[in-house]
Amino acid sequence: MLMIIDKLNYIYNPGNAYEKHALKDINLVINEGDFIGLIGHTGSGKSTLTQHLNGLLRATSGSIYYRGQDIYADNYNMKELRSKVGLVFQYPEHQLFETTVYKDVSFGPRNLGLEPLEVDLRTYEAIKMVGLSDEILDVSPFELSGGQKRRVAIAGVLAMKPELLILDEPTAGLDPKGRDEILEQIAKLHRQNHITIILVSHSMEDIAK
């Protein structure tokens, strides 16, 4: 088992008038190679749950185990967890900031202190994994279409070589063509690269695809 979530609870603003119980006794087992669809209406706690899986939020109570280790243990390496559990936020293209696609996709591997050759390899592999040509590596990400920007943002997470990839509303704001292309690319990632994926959506149609 890759990850176990056991009786997870999370309360926003505990103890005051704005207290909200966002997650209540959540239990989930994630196995390697799973493709999990997480569906619910806006405000149902989907994003709150996913932000627990790579340690961005800490549970009010309950436990999370990654490869058998308690991520809330005092000596647990949270930085390593975040390199293994890749989280692509909603509208990830808003986080693009570099002058070229190459610099954006390679940002994570460069910050790991990897050798330049390994950084290059990861960057080229990640771009191909999202169905883009390496010819765009020297292009500014801001010259790309919305769907292409989204793929570049996903490639930046894939370049970190995560064992678990979480995509939060990956089709949000895209036109029908862009939505279909992104969903097909995600399905292909799972089929061809055997990456464990959690796809978060409010759309049953997206999950069904």
Regions from the language model: what does each represent?
Residues S140-L144, Q148:
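Conserved ABC ATPase signature
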Residues I39-H41:
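The feature captures the beta-strand-to-loop junction immediately N-terminal to the Walker
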Residues L117-E135:
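Conserved ABC ATPase "signature" region
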